[in-house]
């Protein structure tokens, strides 16, 4: 898979904008999706049996005319999640994103400390889609009610203890960030929050000239889906018996799923390779730091330290 490309799509009443929610479990992805939709369609962690286990999608036309397709992902980037599971759900996500990805909402929480899992989210996104995906990222901070209670702005919160990698994400995503209170019952506030968030999505559309993010995997999925559709149409146009047509459709569906599985396995390998490279880079950096500390203690010259870009 290459670093990704873009697919020309105008902002029209016919083409929905695909907005993908990513982030750690418990950060409020599903609640943010519900705020965008305007009603509860995605189950949140607060409901024990309702945590998102598979990518889900829901489309809506907002009050100000945005036609959006919100894709809620499970906690794909939690540290406990396997590369196999991530890859399968990414393929599912791309299948749901007809026309490409128009925005990725990286959901963080102002209620909790930003952890290694958030940094893992960023690394995994880049490993899967390349650094160009950051051109489509909006950083969403949930827990706006907590900041209000503390009489803090988002800038106050970030100024207190903002990890370097978050600053880097915001820099690379043109500082597109927003705070949202998913618990508010104030209809005016709800509308204002959604408007502000979708304005940032519009900023992405304008900066990319209406082009959605796509990559090799997306195009392969689209090609397989189109082949399946055409084959089913061809079967329906011929005089096969109902039983025979159903059997042939089932066989083509099995082949389609097998091809998607192969794509998933390719992504899984890509993730594992990226994780291995990251581990080696961290190990090398640790070794060089240890050598530096030792040299400072015994005052011996050292060779120059090789720069190591973690992100």
UniProtKB/Swiss-Prot annotation:
Protein induction: Up-regulated by brassinolides. Down-regulated by 2-aminoethoxyvinylglycine (AVG), high CO(2), isoxaben, and propiconazole treatments.
Region (G2): 50-54
Top-level division of the source organism's lineage: Eukaryota
Keywords for this protein: Coiled coil, GTP-binding, Nucleotide-binding
Keyword hit for Nucleotide-binding: yes
GO terms of molecular function: GTP binding
Domain AIG1-type G: 14-222
Pfam families (alphabetical): AIG1
Region of interest: G4: 142-145
Family statement drawn from the similarity comment of this UniProt entry: Belongs to the TRAFAC class TrmE-Era-EngA-EngB-Septin-like GTPase superfamily. AIG1/Toc34/Toc159-like paraseptin GTPase family. IAN subfamily.
Protein name as annotated: Immune-associated nucleotide-binding protein 7
Species name: Arabidopsis thaliana
Lineage: Eukaryota, Viridiplantae, Streptophyta, Embryophyta, Tracheophyta
């Amino acid at each position: 898979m290459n670093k990704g490309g873009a697919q020309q799509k105008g902002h029209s009443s016919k083409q929905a904008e695909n907005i993908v929610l990513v982030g750690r479990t418990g950060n409020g992805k599903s609640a943010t999706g519900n705020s965008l939709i305007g009603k509860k369609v995605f189950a949140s962690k607060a409901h024990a049996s309702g945590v998102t286990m598979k990518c889900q999608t829901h489309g809506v036309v907002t009050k100000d005319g945005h036609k959006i397709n919100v894709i809620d992902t499970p906690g794909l980037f939690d540290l406990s999640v396997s590369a196999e599971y991530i890859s399968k759900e990414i393929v599912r996500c791309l299948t749901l994103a007809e026309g490409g990805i128009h925005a990725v909402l990286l959901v963080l929480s102002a209620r909790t400390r930003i952890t290694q899992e958030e940094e893992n989210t960023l690394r995994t996104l880049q490993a899967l889609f390349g650094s160009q995906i950051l051109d489509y990222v909006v950083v969403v901070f949930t827990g706006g009610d907590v900041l209000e209670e503390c009489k803090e702005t988002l800038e106050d919160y970030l100024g207190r203890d903002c990890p370097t990698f978050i600053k880097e994400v915001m820099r690379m995503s043109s500082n597109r960030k927003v705070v949202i209170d998913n618990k508010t019952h104030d209809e005016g506030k709800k509308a204002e929050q959604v408007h502000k968030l979708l304005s940032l999505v519009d900023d992405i559309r304008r900066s990319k000239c209406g082009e959605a993010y796509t990559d090799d995997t997306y195009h392969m999925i689209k090609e397989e889906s189109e082949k399946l559709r055409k084959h089913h149409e061809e079967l329906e146009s011929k005089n096969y018996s109902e039983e025979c047509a159903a059997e042939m459709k089932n066989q083509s569906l099995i082949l389609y799923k097998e091809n998607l599985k192969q794509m998933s396995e390719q992504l899984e390998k890509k993730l594992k390779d990226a994780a291995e490279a990251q581990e080696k880079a961290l190990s090398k950096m640790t070794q060089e730091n240890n050598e530096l500390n030792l040299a400072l203690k015994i005052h011996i010259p050292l060779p120059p330290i090789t720069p190591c870009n973690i992100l």
